[in-house]
């Protein structure tokens, strides 16, 4: 991912009320660090590593779960061999202890404080991450995607005159933010204050809020710190101590940054350029983008590339797709034109055979009239009466004897 090329090599310095006429509507050169490649992979990795360095070691008590004189009852008692609490007269007596599967027992693999809490990160990688985060602050799309309200901001990157560093009161700081169109983002952070979910609210982390603008100043000991530090969501940082945790909170690129003129002019000397190494960071040169122009279609269709590209090859030979004529009728019809006629004749013969069979069955199934049905029923009843009269079972007292005699 490459930051979009700067449309102008100059950035306008936004003047404030009360500035001298010489300080208003001036311009500064855009430093090369603002056009460096944006590497979210490096930023995410470095942020995840250095954020571990502020962790406080924790562990469970070494005595937890073992503050009882439990002993195993051994075998032959029809219970498990887990250690059990001695004594009697209480529910606790006889209960299992010590094991991680027991109520009141220790946890599995109790945590220790000698865990490797901190992470070491290569110096060059940390510098690349900060450079990428700085470059992302100049891309309005990334800043808006992060959720900052910059609709009323006149220009990105946003640079204000050095008179902002002399602001002492918070009311004056709010006035400055309103003049440059950045107060909407600070207001968003203020309105987002809420109570933290979970147990963190009991541990001095009760309130959470969104991030507002980051004010970067260039004068050591400037009064601007006291003016802006009490605004919710607004953070401050000296240009020589830029921190990735502030430039890309959560590892997410696109923090809304307000630069003072003096801080913006120092970026070139602190981070150097693509050809000239940094004056403050020994031997550091800005990373170059793999593609100077990210518009690949424009590069391919340019006259320089098209003049040396080989023409499109025509008449390429492709393998013939062979189909089985025994399974594919269209292929069979191409190979044997008579197959279509033979297929039709077989279908007609089958249809005529089915029709003849149906007619034959209908002819055999003679329709019986109502009178004939009544005559058949009467004949059946007469035959039944004859069978009863001809039998001599009434002469036997026991019907089963008649059955035996008849057999």
UniProtKB/Swiss-Prot annotation:
Molecular function as annotated in GO: mRNA binding; structural constituent of ribosome
Q: Which InterPro entries does the record match to this protein?
A: Ribos_uL4_C_dom (IPR025755), Ribosomal_uL4 (IPR002136), Ribosomal_uL4_dom_sf (IPR023574), Ribosomal_uL4_euk/arc_CS (IPR013000), Ribosomal_uL4_euk/arch (IPR045240)
Q: Which GO terms describe its cellular component?
A: cytosolic large ribosomal subunit; cytosolic ribosome; nucleolus; plant-type vacuole; plasma membrane; plasmodesma; vacuole
Keyword Ribonucleoprotein part of the UniProt annotation: yes
Supply the alphabetized keyword list: Ribonucleoprotein, Ribosomal protein
Residues covered by region (Disordered): 57-96
PROSITE patterns hit by this protein: RIBOSOMAL_L1E (PS00939)
Biological process terms in GO annotation: translation
Protein family membership: Belongs to the universal ribosomal protein uL4 family.
The record's listing under PANTHER family reads: 60S RIBOSOMAL PROTEIN L4 (PTHR19431)
Q: What is this protein called?
A: Large ribosomal subunit protein uL4y
Q: Which organism is it from?
A: Arabidopsis thaliana (Mouse-ear cress)
